[in-house]
Amino acid sequence: MRYHQYYPVDIVNGPGTRCTLFVSGCVHECPGCYNKSTWRLNSGQPFTKEMEDKIIADLNDTRIHRQGISLSGGDPLHPQNVPDILALVQRIHAECPGKDIWVWTGYKLDELNAAQMQVVDLINVLVDGKFVQDLKDPALIWRGSSNQVVHHLR
């Protein structure tokens, strides 16, 4: 997996103070997407064990209380990203108790395959659906267009 940006402290992409990772790779290519630079799978930089360790350390850093992590992109549920995203969320569950995990994807919840559902089974919130320019609404919270759904899973 590759990623474009990691924010160790973020107050924009989800509730509370959190970490945010923007991964590379998106097949949806939504017109009007605010993050087009993340579409190509080979863009950005490699997601390494060192970066994964940094995320875990940041989530456990007691100097700044972080509520959890937001995974966006690109698309964390792109088939090529799923193995690394699954490993990351499993590790967060094991090593960062009490931290919530939010994932944004262009796929719809009812369209996900078994591998993608393994990730969804471990997260707290899934924001699903492609961004639709004609349905854009700046008043929406945690989503860009009114067709997208915020699923509070656990």
UniProtKB/Swiss-Prot annotation:
Q: Where in the cell is it found?
A: Cytoplasm
Mind telling me which GO cellular component terms the entry cites?
cytoplasm
Q: Which Pfam families match?
A: Fer4_12 (PF13353)
Protein name per the record: Anaerobic ribonucleoside-triphosphate reductase-activating protein
Q: What is the top-level taxon of the source organism?
A: Bacteria
* Main localization category: cytoplasm
By sequence similarity, the record places it as follows:
Belongs to the organic radical-activating enzymes family.
State its cofactor: [4Fe-4S] cluster
Which function does this protein serve? Answer: Activation of anaerobic ribonucleoside-triphosphate reductase under anaerobic conditions by generation of an organic free radical, using S-adenosylmethionine and reduced flavodoxin as cosubstrates to produce 5'-deoxy-adenosine.
Q: Which InterPro entries match?
A: Aldolase_TIM, NrdG, Organic_radical-activating, Radical_activat_CS
SUPFAM superfamilies per record = Radical SAM enzymes
At which positions is [4Fe-4S] cluster bound? 26, 30, 33
Amino acids binding S-adenosyl-L-methionine = 32-34, 74
Reaction(s) catalysed by this chain, per the record, are:
glycyl-[protein] + reduced [flavodoxin] + S-adenosyl-L-methionine = glycin-2-yl radical-[protein] + semiquinone [flavodoxin] + 5'-deoxyadenosine + L-methionine + H(+)
List the gene name: nrdG
